[in-house]
Structures are given as C-alpha cells and as structure tokens.
C-alpha cells in the first residue's frame, strides 16, 4: 500500500512520542491523527523500521539537530510557514534524494519530539509546527511515489546491511545541507 509522506511522518511522530514521551500523546498529535486518519499504525512494520533508521540519524547527529532546531525556533516568526520555507530551500531544485528525504524526516521527528516533550512549549507553537512540517512534507509525495513508495524504500535498507550504512552516511551528509539551508533562510529573514 502506498502511504503519503504526511501519513508516514505523523505515524513516526506518534511512535516517537510514545517512545520518548511521558506516556501520553500530545493533544496536537491526537488532533492531527483525527484530522488525517492514518491508514497505518505507529506500530506498523514500515513505521518501526523508519523509526529505527531516523533514531540512528538523530543519535549520530544530535548536536547538529539540537543546534539547528534551537536556531530555527528562536528566529522564526511564522513557524508553520517557515517549515515550508526550509523545505523549499532543501529541495529547491526539485531533485530529492533518499538522504535529503531522510534528513528532513529525522529533523521533523526531532522537532516534534522536542516540542511535545517540553511541557513549557505553548500549545499554539506545537500546533503550528506540527501542521507546518506535515504540510511541507507533502512536497515529497511525487518523488517517493516514483521510487515505489515509502514501503519499498525501507525494504532496501535493512539495519546492519551495507545499504543501511550508506543510507545513514548519506543522510548525515545531507543533514549539513539542512543546517546550511536553515541558516540561509534565517539570515535572509533577518534582513
């Protein structure tokens, strides 16, 4: 079955919230799940495999993720629209790659985790952020469909395999592009 990027990312954020949260799902994620009924469960094999892959990317690049997110959230004025702006900076040539897609998904999952686990984050900031990342991510759907869908892409990346290692490596390199794009976006927005 072909899943949209929105469905995959939302299921990943819900899964991640259950793993790293305080046992309850953030109300914004509950609302998003009601607005976009999921055709796959956060416990689905596809979601679990992507979660492992994205966790590895986040763990290997934790300082970069934290620094980039802090810079983004500190300098953004319209968080929902700004997710789309960063997405457009990363994929502006219309030439996505698996590394870019995974770096983007990992950054979004990390952002969602950071926002949902921080009790002092205002509801509206979490709401606008989750909406912004889900909407921006829909821009990957055409490319993902051409690659055979999210399910096909993860089947080729089994943890421990050579391809899995290369995927992690390429996603790490692509993360630097994410950092550069977010800095460019932020500095452009300040002038």
UniProtKB/Swiss-Prot annotation:
One GO term of the biological process aspect: negative regulation of release of cytochrome c from mitochondria
Membrane topology reported for the UniProt record: Single-pass membrane protein
Residue ranges annotated as motif BH1: 89-109
Subcellular location: Host membrane; Host mitochondrion
Miscellaneous comment: EA-R is part of the restricted EA-complex.
Binding partners and assembly: Interacts with isoform 1 of host VRK2; this interaction is involved in protecting cells from apoptosis. Interacts with host PRA1; this interaction seems to modulate BHRF1 anti-apoptotic activity. Interacts with host BCL2L11. Interacts with host BAD and BBC3. Interacts with BALF1; BALF1 acting as a negative regulator of the survival function of BHRF1. Interacts with host BECN1.
Glycosylated residues, chain numbering: 22, 118
GO annotations of cellular component type: host cell membrane; host cell mitochondrion; membrane
Main localization category: host cell
A Pfam family matched in the record: Bcl-2
Sequence segments annotated as region (Interaction with host VRK2): 1-18, 89-142
This protein's name: Apoptosis regulator BHRF1
InterPro entries to which the protein is assigned, alphabetical: Bcl-2-like_sf, Bcl-2_BH1-3, Bcl2-like, Bcl2_BH2_motif_CS
Family indicated by similarity: Belongs to the Bcl-2 family.
Function according to Swiss-Prot or TrEMBL: Prevents premature death of the host cell during virus production, which would otherwise reduce the amount of progeny virus. Acts as a host B-cell leukemia/lymphoma 2 (Bcl-2) homolog, and interacts with pro-apoptotic proteins to prevent mitochondria permeabilization, release of cytochrome c and subsequent apoptosis of the host cell. In addition, plays a role in the inhibiton of host BECN1-mediated starvation-induced autophagy without affecting basal levels of autophagy.
Keywords, alphabetical: Apoptosis, Early protein, Glycoprotein, Host membrane, Host mitochondrion, Host-virus interaction, Inhibition of host apoptosis by viral BCL2-like protein, Inhibition of host autophagy by virus, Membrane, Modulation of host cell apoptosis by virus, Transmembrane, Transmembrane helix
Motif (BH2) on chain: 142-157
Membrane-spanning parts: 166-186
